[in-house]
Amino acid sequence: MSVHKLYNTITITIIFISNMIFGQSYIDNLKFKPIAENVSQRAITSIIKDQKGIMWIGTQGDGIYSFNGHELKNYIHKWGDKKTLNSSGVNTVFLDSNNNLWVGTDEGLNLYQRDLDQFIRIKFDDLNSRNQVRAIGENEQKKLLIGTHGSGVFELDTSNQKVEVVKVLAYDNISKLQINDIKTTPRGAILFGSNIGLLKYNSLKNELNYAEFTTLSQPEIIKKPIESILTKLDGNIWLGTTNEGLIKISTSPTNYFEFKNYTITNKRILSLETDRNGAIFCGTENDGLIILDNQGTVKSFRFNKSDTNGIKSNSIWSVFIDDESRVWIGYFNQGVDIYDNENERFKSIESIPNKDQSLFSKSVTSITQDKKGRFWIGISDGGVDVYDPKKETFTHLLNQDNTIAKGLKSSDVVSVFIDSNQNTWVGTWNSGLFLLKKGYKVFENIQIKNSNILKSNRIMSFAEDSNGRIWIGSFLTGLYSYDQKSGTLKHYQSETYESLYINSKNIRKLIVDHQNNIWIGTRTGLYKIENPDSKTPKITPYSSIINNSSESRIRGNLLSTIIEDKQNNIWIGTDGDGLCKLNPITEEIKWFDLSENFDHQSIKSIIQTKDGEIWLAGNNGISKFDSVKNEFINYNTQDGLITNNFNKNSNYLSDNGILYFGCYKGINYFDPKAITTNPTPPVVYLTDFKISNLSIIPSEMGSPLKKVVNETAKIKLGHDQNMFTIDYFGLGYTRSKNIEYAYYLEGFETDWNYVKKIRNATYTNIPAGDYNFKVKAVNSDGIWNETPTVLGIKILVPWWKTNVALLIFLLLTLTIVYVIYKFLKVRLVERQQIKNEREERAQDEALNAKKIQFFTNISHEFRTPLTLILNPLEAIIGNKTVELPSDIEEKHTIIYKNSKRLSRLIDELMDF
């Protein structure tokens, strides 16, 4: 017996109608835009947002992406690199209570390391390390619960990465068990969605069994295959099934559980989310996006190739609603879309190809509204469309079989006006004037060929005075009026008008002021006409007044639009020369420029709200004048406008205060009271640090970074690393392209560098020292984050300029000086010794010379007496005739021998 029969629950079968309405709910007009062009076209299996505000997108085949509102960063499996994902097939992404990011893949589990921007692969066991992880949860002990397809359920202690097997009591064939989702209820119950039904985890026993729910009759279990689970703060549990729609489990006032089955689809509900209003968003396989509000009303969004703002595919694998109510949807093969309510402040009415219930064509030239609340919309090349916002229907008056009015035969409509009697006036570019009187079904056409008064078929502008007379401005034939009482048309071409060429002016815009004066804006300036019907009307040309003003910038007085505000000032919009305000009494002219944050060159239309706010449209979007700050607040396509270029005098203020502006792509409309300032400024994160244009990778050899730069408080750089670039971004997903930045290097600069939308800062040749790099951002509404992001930077002095090096240099210098001193001293001593030795040697040589001379002299002195001795002795000894006594002869011989010996010694001495 089925669950819904057991508990008398209500089965709701819905036939989806594409134009089903939720009153004024934002769900009526969900407009989805891709987050980026380069996001994966693989199945988007998971989308989450971490505590820092970074989005993480899991894909089946392209790994995981991080997204910060500006750019995507892709993490994939890389063969041989264990710091990457173990598989690019990502099935689920989970953020635990400590902001740790876990990624379940076809090959197991991964933990993201923020400090190093890399992954750790978690191994379950040695025998079965390849597990197809499909769901991740967390229990009260901060342990992870991991559900797989075909490998069972595991519990992981994140403190030591110890893995335990969870016993599954509900099913004994683990190889066929498929865990699809894990969610925790507000009461702490942990539920598992699986192919065998809804299971509940028992943390005390570490086991899994069927979840039992107490009802009025008996405990019941759900054995339908469950694809997704949503637990809400109100205690209700929502289950997305495989083919039986949506199941709601709620607690009754008697604390019994009640079941309700919503058969909203027979396709797989792959993802469930809820918004702040309690609406349930269901992402389905091949059945689009289905939303169930808290009243039980269902709206279905399906792919429509003619709807550029609709969903891109009927196969939606993931839905995520962030803390700022943005809706993110991930497709099977179309990437990721986002709906941002903040971008929908400006709504639009557009021409959609092949859709009859849209504008006939794009370029809207005029907008007005009748008493029935219907909008009459003038269209270039499209005639007039009548739009009924209550019925959301368009009636194209060019179609002669329409039920509102026939006879409009011109497609080139310039202006549409509804007077106080509810007569409708249509001015065309080439077919004159069309008048549809109240209660009539056929337009009356007034043009040159059937009127003796009308001289131009180009009708540019209408206005009504307090007497009910209609004033008409034409192209090149000036001013006309139409008296509704008499039904007569009048052309103003008297001498006074001719003298100022009013009768041949190209009137672009005319208004009637509070005194019934007529103001006309032409291609040759501004004119005020008082008492226009008198014989001598007073016509004041303001061209000379404007041209003679000290601030005048008009070249040719090319006016495009004028209005009178509640203070009776005349606001003047020009083609190419900007905006000015005229005080008709003092004739004071006030021009607006960049000093008031005014950045339009051409003003196409101006309008004032009931609260007195001035809004204008031009060639650069829409602007509001803030009278308190005396400056303009500007809005463009980044804020949700369909274009920045608007048509002349195509605007309207409805009775309920809604502003409408016509442009070349349709109509933008909005409630000015809803255009509030975003009070949250962007937080700035650092994304890269480059030295000499090369990105620095943490923990690489020689890298000054130990962590990624955004996780680094201070970085220390060498003296040769003083040319660096810091990349940054301001976190934001609403109009992120409008975020602007300012930075400065404290200690090197004294003031902020305001760099508009540039997201990097480069410094070169920074001297050694301690610095703080500071960067802040401002959101699109001008709110600055006054708490800048700071990175400390220390640039080291060259090693040869350090104190230790200087001390070493000093000691080395002193040592060298000492060595040189010692060396010189030794050399000096040696030189002195040599000198002394030389002097001693010279003295010795001189002494020797004197001695030799002395010896020589003595030798000569000795030789002569000796010779005188030897000669007699030789004669005595040689005289044989004289016989001497033997003793005397012997003594003579001794004397002779010694004398001879002495003579030889003297000869030797002489020879020396």
Which residues does each PLM region occupy?
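Residue-level "micro-hotspots" composed of small/polar
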Residues: 23-49, 79-89, 129, 175, ...
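Residue-level detector of Asp-centered blade-edge/turn motifs that repeat once per structural unit
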Residues: 49-52, 95-98, 138-141, 184-187, ...
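Conserved beta-propeller blade signature
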Residues: 55-56, 100-102, 143-145, 189-192, ...
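Short loop/turn segments that connect beta-strands within beta-propeller blades
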Residues: 68-71, 113-117, 157-161, 202-206, ...
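Hydrophobic anchor positions in the alpha-helical DHp
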Residues: 667, 909-912
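Primarily the dimerization/phosphotransfer
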Residues: 830-881, 897, 911
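Short alpha-helical segment of the dimerization/phosphotransfer core of two-component systems
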Residues: 894-902
